[in-house]
């Protein structure tokens, strides 16, 4: 399918809105370049001054950056801080009656939570975790929750007492939930009875019951359940407790735990190319500093702004730009339960009109869906409150960018096409809305203090227009600190492939092109990760799940372009000897494999197409050559070296099958 379907438009340059630029924090490219120069001249002083100015410390740090044990970098060493204090308490002096969170439920219910109310609810929740569940500093708490205000209370309550939270996306299966509970060795799991989705109750507690069945998660002592949709659920005596009944008996005073700068703030599991999810570990001070700075620079957040990021808290975007970033700035953040399509495709635009949203941040998949399903819906609403639009999670194609720019932003709003990852904690490459001339589908320039470069495998810089590996060549405060419990995997995944001046640099796994102006365009993954609707899915875990089907001998999964999701999943499947597959059986097999994927991973992992083949192209060492399969799917000529293949004829047979199926 053709994604970049308006290439002429993609060549146009759009300058920032002049009226907006005049009052922006960074008003022009000269100011941007001054900040870049300042960071380059004295890197540690640049970050140290930002940390002193922007964060509230219980005890000042005495060293900005410690690289002695690289790549296990330490930032703001020996400083003492608490993230919940920085997100709530420090705002109470002059913002206690300001709305911190606007929540809108799927069924039309609404709640505005002030900073004073947030302080009270978080403290009561923190006391509940301490007093009734014996949660202490360093304990891991799994949060398997929908998009409701209580989810934020749980996150901030953990940070207040020094517990490490790990949020599992509420769409993940019991098996995926179990894997994450066990890897984190979580002591407590917090969930809801359910939520509302498309106007109907959607249950979560039964999935937790399955995950914990037969004592398969021995570290879990108790579970805490928030009653949301009030549907009947099963309770296990002595294990399951109801939040709503217990929290009101707790004091609303809870002193924040004094945390070291480098104490883990949270774990967030992301897909790994080897199949087992990786527990990305983030620190307290460095992560929060960059969450706040990117809110100020990239979104130019203002005191009277209503900020809406549509991401789920189960993803890093929800962590940084629904919760920690906006609240660190003392801003107002919106939380929406349910889907964009209920009761109709005008829901999001209606919310922007009703709440006078100033800054709006969403995914290209959502934009493409809204464009395809409700192209004329935006014209029914007043969207003139919008000042900055943002995209996240995947590259955005020019047609979607154009519609977003013209129809949602009325050709007046800068679009900040942000590139970053779970591992980076916050934005790495992005336009600045008051300064950067923008181009459709281009992430533009690294932010001040960030050294992002496009390199060849030998560490040399690519020439303009050449594709290379996107790397970050200097440490930054919000970077991943480790993979939970697996230092070797941390090094192997990020710091083992490309060297610059004899030192391994951070390898993002994304391919990119830099132009003669230094603008960076993201091409997509270079490893075995597929980006479906902005969600990273490892092909290894998909293949592992499919292989559980009794008729499947082996399989290989690759990403394919999709006009709505960005990428879809295409499987090459080898069936058992003698197994035949007519059209009807093929469709039934596809249905069965997708059922397995829904159970093993979740409904976000769904095969869009399958091809039944006699074998897979493998090297003599047994490695599947997925690049060849990608070329076949895209109908591109096979340019890869086939001399290392065990059986070259397999490629010819697959090409013949592909041509027959056209």
From Swiss-Prot:
Residues that bind Mg(2+): 549, 552
CDD domains registered for this protein in UniProt: ACS
UniProt-listed InterPro entries: Ac_CoA_lig, ACAS_N, AMP-bd_C, AMP-bd_C_sf, AMP-binding_CS, AMP-dep_synth/lig_dom, ANL_N_sf
Catalytic activity: acetate + ATP + CoA = acetyl-CoA + AMP + diphosphate
An example Gene Ontology biological process: acetyl-CoA biosynthetic process from acetate
Domain of life: Bacteria
Modification sites for N6-acetyllysine: 623
Purpose: Catalyzes the conversion of acetate into acetyl-CoA (AcCoA), an essential intermediate at the junction of anabolic and catabolic pathways. AcsA undergoes a two-step reaction. In the first half reaction, AcsA combines acetate with ATP to form acetyl-adenylate (AcAMP) intermediate. In the second half reaction, it can then transfer the acetyl group from AcAMP to the sulfhydryl group of CoA, forming the product AcCoA.
Name this polypeptide is given: Acetyl-coenzyme A synthetase
Annotated gene: acsA
């Amino acid at each position: 399918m053709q994604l970049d379907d308006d290439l002429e438009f993609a060549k146009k340059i759009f300058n920032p809105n002049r009226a907006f630029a005049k009052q922006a924090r960074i008003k022009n490219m000269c100011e941007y370049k001054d900040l870049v120069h300042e960071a380059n001249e004295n890197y540690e002083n640049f970050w140290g001054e930002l940390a002193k100015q922007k964060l509230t410390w219980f005890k000042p740090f005495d060293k900005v950056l410690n690289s002695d044990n690289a790549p296990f970098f330490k930032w703001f060493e020996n400083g003492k801080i608490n993230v919940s204090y920085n997100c709530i308490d420090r705002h109470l002096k002059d913002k206690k009656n300001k709305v911190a969170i606007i929540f809108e439920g799927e069924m039309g219910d609404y709640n505005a939570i002030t900073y004073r109310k947030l302080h009270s609810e978080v403290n009561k929740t923190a006391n509940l975790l301490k007093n009734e569940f014996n949660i202490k500093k360093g304990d891991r708490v799994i949060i398997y929750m929908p998009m409701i205000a209580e989810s934020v209370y749980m996150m901030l309550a953990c940070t207040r007492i020094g517990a490490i939270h790990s949020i599992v996306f509420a769409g993940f299966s019991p098996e995926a939930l179990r894997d994450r509970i066990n890897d984190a060795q979580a002591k407590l799991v917090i969930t809801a009875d359910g939520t509302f989705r498309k106007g109907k109750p959607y249950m979560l507690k039964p999935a937790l019951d399955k995950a914990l069945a037969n004592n398969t998660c021995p570290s879990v002592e108790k579970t805490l359940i928030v009653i949301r949709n009030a549907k009947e659920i099963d309770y296990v005596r002595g294990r399951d407790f109801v939040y709503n009944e217990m929290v009101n008996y707790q004091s609303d005073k809870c002193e924040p735990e004094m945390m070291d700068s480098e104490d883990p703030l949270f774990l967030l599991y992301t897909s790994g190319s080897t199949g087992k999810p990786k527990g990305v570990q983030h620190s307290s001070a460095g992560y929060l500093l960059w969450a706040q700075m990117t809110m100020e620079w990239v979104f130019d957040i203002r005191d009277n702004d209503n900020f809406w990021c549509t991401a789920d808290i189960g993803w890093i975007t929800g962590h940084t730009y629904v919760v920690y970033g906006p609240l660190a700035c003392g801003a107002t953040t919106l939380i929406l339960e349910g889907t964009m399509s209920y009761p109709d495709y005008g829901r999001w635009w209606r919310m922007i009109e009703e709440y006078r949203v100033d800054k709006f941040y969403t995914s290209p998949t959502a934009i493409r869906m809204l464009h395809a399903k409700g192209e004329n819906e935006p014209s029914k609403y007043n969207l003139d409150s919008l000042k900055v639009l943002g995209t996240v999670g995947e590259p955005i194609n020019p047609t979607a960018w154009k519609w977003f720019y013209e129809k949602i932003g009325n050709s007046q709003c800068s679009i900040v096409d942000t590139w970053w990852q779970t591992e980076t904690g916050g934005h790495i490459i992005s336009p600045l809305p008051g300064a950067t001339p923008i181009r459709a589908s281009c992430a533009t320039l690294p932010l001040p203090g960030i050294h992002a470069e496009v390199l060849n495998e030998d560490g040399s810089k690519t020439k303009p227009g050449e594709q290379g590996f996107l790397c970050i060549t200097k440490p930054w405060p919000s970077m991943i600190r480790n993979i939970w419990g697996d230092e070797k995997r941390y090094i192997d995944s990020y710091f083992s492939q490309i060297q610059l001046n004899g030192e391994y640099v951070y390898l993002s796994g994304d391919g990119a092109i830099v132009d003669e102006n230094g603008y960076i365009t993201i091409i997509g993954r270079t490893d075995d990760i597929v980006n479906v609707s902005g969600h990273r899915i490892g092909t290894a875990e998909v293949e592992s799940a499919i292989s559980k089907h009794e008729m499947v001998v082996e399989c290989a999964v690759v990403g394919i372009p999709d006009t709505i999701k960005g990428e879809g999943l295409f499987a090459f499947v080898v069936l058992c000897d003698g197994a035949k597959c007519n059209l009807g059986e093929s469709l039934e097999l596809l249905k069965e494999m997708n059922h397995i994927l829904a159970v093993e991973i979740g409904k976000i992992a769904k095969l869009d197409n399958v091809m039944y083949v006699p074998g897979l192209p493998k090297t003599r060492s047994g490695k599947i050559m997925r690049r060849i399969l990608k070329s076949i799917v895209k109908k591109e000529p096979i340019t890869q070296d086939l001399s290392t293949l065990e059986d070259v004829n397999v490629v010819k047979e697959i090409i013949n099958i592909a041509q027959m199926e056209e």
